[in-house]
Regions:
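Short, solvent-exposed helix-loop connector elements
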Residues: 178-189, 209, 213
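Conserved catalytic-core segments of large NTP-driven translation/proteostasis enzymes
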Residues: 190-191, 201
Length: 234
């Protein structure tokens, strides 16, 4: 009997999918049944290597070593989720698994999570894409009836890679630059203070500017009136 390996983004989603497609036999790290094996990632199982992976000199944060710009990108298995990656890799290598279903979240990050696992495991088996925005039973059933060719989302994967690598370049360099330059200039900031720059930081700063800064800049003064009642007239 041949199987399709379905990979979801998190265990709760995998369980919802397994219930609909009839994979009801629970194993260590996956569910199996009715011609399907359903397993899951736990967030990002594969992540970009840290700077010291490229060169040991980056273990020490030095202003003179910046910027850090890898000529090629390397990835590593996240230590906290290494076991689950191993389970997925073994499932991909099973001879009775003839294809995969990418069931991670329908979006850029979901695409990245699956593809990095797929590539890191050196899997060459064909895969289809489950693209749904609801976890209702009917939506899951309809989604499996209309599975897409996984390669139709190659551009989305490339966009996710660009976002991830840009985030790494900005985050790693800006964090080290701010800390080393601050300490180098002997400002009042404590030596062990660490400022982490990431996309979330930039997005938050942008939101605050849009909410507060632009309102101040575009503010136009105007007259206003207040009503009052003289109690003596009653």
């Amino acid at each position: 009997m041949s199987y399709k390996l379905v990979i979801a983004e998190k265990p709760s989603v995998a369980q919802s999918i397994a219930k609909v497609i009839g994979a009801d036999k629970r194993e260590d790290g996956y569910l199996e049944g009715n011609g399907y094996i359903v397993s899951w990632c736990v967030g990002h199982l594969v992540e970009l290597a840290s700077p010291e992976f490229y060169d040991e000199k980056y273990e020490k944060w030095r202003y003179e070593d910046l910027p850090i710009l890898p000529s090629e990108w390397n990835y590593q298995i996240a230590e906290a989720t290494r076991k689950q990656f191993g389970i997925l890799k073994k499932l991909m290598e099973r001879e009775d698994v003839t294809g995969l279903v990418e069931a991670t979240d329908a979006g850029r990050e979901g695409e990245l999570i699956f593809r990095l696992v797929y590539d890191q495991a050196k899997c060459k088996k064909p895969f289809e894409r489950l693209w749904i925005s609801s976890m209702e039973d009917q939506a899951i059933s309809d989604g499996f009836f209309h599975l897409k060719n996984g390669r139709e989302y190659d551009d989305l994967y490339r966009a996710a890679l660009c976002r991830e690598r840009a985030d790494w370049i900005v985050g790693m360099n800006a964090t080290r630059l701010f800390l080393t330059d601050t300490n180098r200039r002997r400002t009042a900031v404590k030596p062990m203070t660490v400022f982490l720059f990431r996309q979330v930081f930039k997005k938050s700063l942008s939101c605050e500017y849009n909410r507060s800064g632009r309102k101040v800049i575009s503010y136009i003064g105007c007259n206003f009136f207040m009503n009052s009642i003289d109690k003596k007239t009653w």
